[in-house]
C-alpha cells in the first residue's frame, strides 16, 4: 500500500462572501500536485453557499417539538432548533412521516432509514459555539457536493477531490467526490478527523 501523508491547509475563516473553489486555489498554491487528493469540510462548503441560519430566525413547529424527544444523544436532531432547521428544507410533514417509517423500520432491526429518507436530518449541524462568526449558526448540508468536488479537481488539476463530513466521534462520510475516487476508502482515511471540530482554520 502506498504511503499516505495528511497535510492540513491553513486558511482564514471562510464566509458566505467567498467562493470555495477560488479560496482553495488561493491557499493551496504550490502545494497540490497531480497525485494529491484534496478534501474539504462540508460545513465550510455550506457556509460559502450561504446555507446557514440562526435559531432566532426559526419558529419551531409542534412536529419538531414532538420528534426531538425521540432522538437519543446530543446530535443536532436532539436540538429543537436543529430539528426545525432540517424541517425548513425537507418539509415538516415529510420529516414526520419519514420519522414514523424509520421508527417502524427500527422495530424490524433496520437502522438509519429516517436519515436516509431525510438527508438534511443527518447533514444539518446544530449551533456549535465554535468558529466565529458562525458559532451561533445552524449550518445545513452543502448543495451539490459532487459538483463542487468536480470543480475543485478541474481547477487544481489534482488526482481528485471530495467534500467530507467528519467529526471527533470517529464518524466519517464522504458526501461528494470527483470521478475515480472511492468514497469508502477516503472516509476510512479521514476517520481521525484531520479537519478538527473546534475553531480550526
Give residue spans per PLM region.
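N-terminal and secondary-structure boundary signal
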Residues: 1-201
Amino acid at each position: 500500500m502506498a504511503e499516505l501523508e495528511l497535510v492540513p491547509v491553513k486558511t482564514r475563516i471562510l464566509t458566505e462572501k467567498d467562493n470555495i473553489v477560488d479560496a482553495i486555489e488561493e491557499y493551496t498554491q504550490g502545494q497540490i500536485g497531480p497525485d494529491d487528493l484534496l478534501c474539504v469540510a462540508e460545513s465550510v462548503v455550506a457556509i460559502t453557499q450561504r446555507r446557514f441560519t440562526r435559531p432566532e430566525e426559526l419558529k419551531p413547529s409542534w412536529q419538531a417539538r414532538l420528534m426531538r424527544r425521540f432522538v437519543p444523544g446530543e446530535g443536532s436532531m436532539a436540538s429543537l432548533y436543529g430539528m426545525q432547521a432540517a424541517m425548513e428544507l425537507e418539509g415538516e410533514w415529510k420529516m414526520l412521516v419519514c420519522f414514523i417509517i424509520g421508527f417502524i423500520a427500527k422495530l424490524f432491526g433496520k437502522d438509519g432509514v429516517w436519515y436516509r429518507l431525510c438527508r438534511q436530518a443527518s447533514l444539518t449541524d446544530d449551533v456549535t459555539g465554535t468558529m466565529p462568526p458562525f458559532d451561533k449558526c445552524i449550518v445545513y448540508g452543502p448543495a451539490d457536493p459532487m459538483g463542487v468536488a468536480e470543480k475543485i479537481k478541474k481547477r487544481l488539476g489534482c488526482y481528485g477531490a471530495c467534500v467530507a463530513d467528519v467529526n471527533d466521534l470517529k464518524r466519517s462520510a464522504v458526501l461528494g467526490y470527483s470521478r475515480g475516487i472511492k468514497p469508502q476508502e477516503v472516509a476510512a482515511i479521514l476517520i481521525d478527523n484531520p479537519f478538527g471540530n473546534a475553531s480550526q482554520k
